């Protein structure tokens, strides 16, 4: 009798689950059907716009009466004219995210990071089965992470960090086999942590989580291994009779025994971590040993990197820089990486100090920053391991064929600027790059800018506005105050970024700007003179000039931003967040007008000439040469 009742209950539940599936299917089909004259992608996008507050009007050209949304800003379409990308990062948008986003059934990329969007993440988001990238970080989303996120089986990149999300980690996240990167850091999540399939993940900044799931005050679902399958009802399945009852008891006993074994192993690992003086803990993964910290920063063995790079063969050399050489490597699991072998590895401080600094750097995670994949440390060697960027650096691509078109150059400028904004204004503690140049801006598979080589940048103390140290950088990119006093600040990077913009405009290295036109004297004065005389055709890349494939207004705006960034006095230069807005067309006119009223640039031009543009002083240096000068000791404030 009892088994019959259980069976009836299961049949009833299965029936309702089937009805729910039919409802979901019908709603999905309804999203694909459209009455005559109605484009449901347009309808969905207009619903999204209606739920958002857009102070800068970036969505103004979204028109409800339009037939095709593919020409709208922030919208990307496929060759078949389906909307596959929605990207409105760092636009100061507020409001909520409309559930209508799920009617954009072909979406592959959603980038809404660095806004002020609040409310709950729509539970319907699990219907976007083609979604590959979802970035909702740095907003004000609250509530639980929808369980349906686990249905996104095509998702490879998921960032929900820096929100106000709460509740337990959905177990469905452990089933996302395609997920390569996951960041849930700095929320209010609680309970045990599932075993993520993502190779790289971060969960720091969630004080209520239970690392092992065995803590006595841990609330939520028990941590389970990925290989264990549970029935959807959560109750044992009886086929009837005492025999099945006994079988259930046996299975229950077995599960209980396995659970005790996992608890014992967890306690052992916890004990070993507590007794390990190292700040990292050992885990096994496949056929090799590695060490990881919270967030899955991996520690490599030196032998492993030797094998990966063919003993650091010159054939694998990708580039040389001020901090060391970079080699292409292939790991045992066929992952392609870039290995930076630091100069003077044995003299970069102790092991604990180095690991602590590396762990802090690894927390700087942003779409436009080169993610630190891992590190290696021995008594004589220190190495950093990064993802391999197949498109190389901006500097190398500027010299390659086909040349970068104007739209890509502008996208590179905005992307690099956003990466620097994160380092300066959102990273804690803040990071100064100190060597911003085209060679340190890498390009991912989609030609998006990724700022690299900030791995050993000095960290800003919260109580200091500058750092005094050895002057490191590339001639032509070094701000005058940094070169003369050794004081670096965020405005030092702003200066270097201004030079980077001119590199993008001219297609030349910093010291080549005036040589083509046989110009002598101060390079920035020459650029300013050309701009005043409205002869920007003398400045623009010859390859772009031949094809006339650039926007004259946008070119003029980029040169203006470059000149604002390279003003002599650091206090007159804009912040990087202001630079981003100006590159996007917001506030440039006001900033430019204010700079023209100031005569500080003209008063200091002679000083710039002395510090930066003496051809005799730097005759033996190229753009790839790194200048290392011991900074003068400062006796006190100046």
Swiss-Prot record:
Effect of loss of the gene: Enhanced susceptibility to geminivirus infection.
Glycosylation sites: 92, 103, 162, 175, 188, 219, 231
Keywords from the named record: ATP-binding, Cell membrane, Glycoprotein, Host-virus interaction, Kinase, Leucine-rich repeat, Membrane, Nucleotide-binding, Phosphoprotein, Plant defense, Receptor, Repeat, Serine/threonine-protein kinase, Signal, Transferase, Transmembrane, Transmembrane helix
Residue numbers carrying Phosphotyrosine: 482
Gene Ontology biological process: defense response to virus; negative regulation of multicellular organism growth; protein autophosphorylation; protein localization to nucleus; protein phosphorylation
Activity regulation as described: Inhibited by the viral nuclear shuttle protein (NSP) that binds to the region required for oligomerization.
Binding annotation for ATP: 318-326, 340
Repeat in keyword set: yes
GO-annotated molecular function: ATP binding; identical protein binding; protein kinase activity; protein serine kinase activity; protein serine/threonine kinase activity
Membrane topology, from the record: Single-pass type I membrane protein
PANTHER family: SOMATIC EMBRYOGENESIS RECEPTOR KINASE 1
Protein name, per record: Protein NSP-INTERACTING KINASE 1
């Amino acid at each position: 009798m009892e088994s019959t009742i259980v069976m009836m209950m299961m049949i009833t539940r299965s029936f309702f689950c089937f009805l729910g599936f039919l409802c979901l299917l019908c709603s999905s089909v309804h999203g694909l059907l459209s009455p005559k004259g109605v484009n449901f992608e347009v309808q969905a996008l207009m619903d999204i716009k209606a739920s958002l507050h857009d102070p800068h009007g970036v969505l103004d050209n979204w028109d409800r009466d339009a037939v095709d949304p593919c020409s709208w800003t922030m919208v990307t379409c496929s060759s078949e004219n389906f909307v596959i990308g929605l990207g409105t990062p760092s636009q100061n948008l507020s409001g909520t995210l409309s559930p209508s986003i799920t009617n954009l059934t072909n979406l592959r990329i959603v980038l809404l990071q660095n806004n002020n969007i609040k409310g709950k993440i729509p539970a319907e988001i699990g219907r976007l089965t083609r979604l590959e990238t979802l970035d909702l970080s740095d907003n004000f989303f609250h509530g639980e992470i929808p369980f349906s996120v686990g249905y996104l089986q095509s998702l490879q990149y998921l960032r929900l960090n820096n929100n106000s999300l709460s509740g337990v980690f959905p177990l469905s996240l452990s089933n996302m086999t395609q997920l390569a990167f996951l960041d849930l850091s700095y929320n209010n999540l609680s309970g045990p942590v599932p075993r993520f399939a993502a190779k790289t993940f971060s969960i720091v900044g969630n004080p209520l989580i239970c690392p092992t799931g065995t803590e006595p005050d841990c609330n939520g679902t028990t941590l389970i291994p990925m290989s264990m399958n549970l029935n959807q009802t959560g109750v044992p399945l009886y086929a009837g009779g005492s025999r099945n009852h006994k079988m259930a008891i046996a299975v229950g006993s077995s599960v209980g025994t396995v659970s005790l074994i996992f608890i014992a192993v967890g306690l052992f690992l916890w004990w070993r971590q507590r007794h390990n003086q190292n700040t990292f803990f050992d885990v096994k993964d496949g056929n090799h040993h590695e060490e990881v910290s919270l967030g899955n920063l991996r520690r490599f063995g030196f032998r492993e990197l030797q094998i990966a790079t063919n003993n650091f063969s010159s054939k694998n050399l990708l580039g040389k820089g001020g901090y060391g050489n970079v080699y292409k490597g292939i790991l045992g699991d066929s992952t392609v990486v870039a290995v930076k072998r630091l100069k003077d590895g044995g003299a970069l401080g102790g092991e604990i100090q180095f690991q602590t600094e590396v762990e802090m750097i690894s927390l700087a995670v942003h779409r436009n920053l080169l993610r630190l994949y891992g590190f290696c440390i021995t008594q004589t060697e220190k190495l950093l391991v990064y993802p391999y960027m197949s498109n190389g650096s901006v500097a190398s691509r500027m010299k390659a064929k086909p040349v970068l078109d104007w739209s890509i150059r502008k996208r590179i400028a905005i992307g690099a600027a956003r990466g620097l904004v994160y380092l300066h204004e959102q990273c804690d503690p803040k990071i100064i790059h100190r060597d911003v140049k085209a060679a340190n801006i890498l390009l991912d598979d989609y030609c998006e800018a990724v700022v690299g080589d900030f791995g050993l940048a000095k960290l800003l103390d919260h109580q200091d506005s500058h750092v005094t140290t050895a002057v490191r950088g590339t001639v032509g990119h070094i701000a005058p105050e940094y070169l003369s006093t050794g004081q670096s600040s965020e405005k030092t990077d702003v200066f270097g970024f201004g030079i980077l913009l001119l590199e993008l405009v001219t297609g030349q290295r910093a010291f080549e700007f005036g040589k083509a036109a046989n110009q002598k004297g101060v390079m920035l004065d020459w650029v300013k003179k050309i701009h005043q005389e409205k002869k920007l055709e003398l400045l623009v890349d010859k390859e772009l000039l031949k094809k006339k494939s650039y926007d004259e207004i946008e070119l003029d705006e980029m040169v203006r931003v470059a000149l604002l960034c390279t003003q002599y006095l650091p206090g007159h230069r804009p912040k990087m967040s202001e630079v981003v807005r100006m590159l996007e067309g917001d506030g440039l006119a006001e900033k430019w007008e204010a700079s023209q009223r100031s005569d500080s640039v003209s008063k200091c031009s002679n000083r710039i000439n002395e510090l930066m543009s003496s051809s005799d002083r730097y005759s033996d240096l190229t753009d790839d040469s790194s200048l290392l000068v011991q900074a003068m000791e400062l006796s006190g404030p100046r």
